[in-house]
Design a protein with these regions (language model features):
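Structured interaction patches on ligand/partner-binding surfaces of diverse proteins
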Residues: 22-23, 103-141
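A short, amphipathic beta-strand motif
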Residues: 36-44, 56
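Bacterial N-terminal signal peptides that target proteins for export
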Residues: 1-9
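A short, solvent-exposed beta-strand micro-motif common in secreted/extracellular proteins
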Residues: 84, 88, 92-110
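Tryptophan-paired
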Residues: 62-91
Length: 141
């Protein structure tokens, strides 16, 4: 009987101590973002090419040095009234130097390319400011 009573007492103490909170935390501290997003719309001017590839890239340096932080192949089917909505998500908190749109007549990464447009100003993604909208134009002319 003494052993059973001791076990119940220890179990009760454990349950009570685990159920008590030491201190309340601010709810916003628990909801801090873990990554950032850069998104926006590209307005295309001119005629979309019938061959080759159009590519959007996000780079930490400009001119680019090494692989991009993000990229996407763009297609004419993705356009709505001459606009293409893009999004780079799950980004590390840091500064990004450029979003660029390029046209590769012979397909990426072969041959030469034409720069169609972009945003070439620093974009700082931080935990306090994790989302940024960047809209710009790209020209096929």
């Amino acid at each position: 009987m003494h052993s059973t009573l001791s076990r119940l007492l220890v179990l009760l103490i454990l349950l009570v101590s685990m159920g008590c909170e030491d201190e309340k935390t601010n709810e916003t501290d628990n909801n801090l973002p873990e990554s950032g997003t850069i998104h926006g719309a590209i307005t295309f001017n001119g005629t979309w090419p019938e061959t080759g590839q159009v590519l959007i890239t996000l780079d930490t340096n400009y001119p680019p040095q090494g692989p991009p932080s993000g990229f996407e192949y763009l297609t004419a089917e993705g356009l709505t009234d001459g606009e293409y909505n893009y999004s780079f998500s799950n980004l590390s908190f840091r500064s990004y130097a450029a979003i660029s749109v390029t046209y590769w007549p012979e397909g990426y990464p072969n041959g030469s390319y034409n720069s169609l447009g972009g945003n070439f100003q620093d974009m700082d993604i931080t935990q306090d400011d994790p989302e940024m909208e960047i809209n710009f134009s790209a020209n096929f002319e």
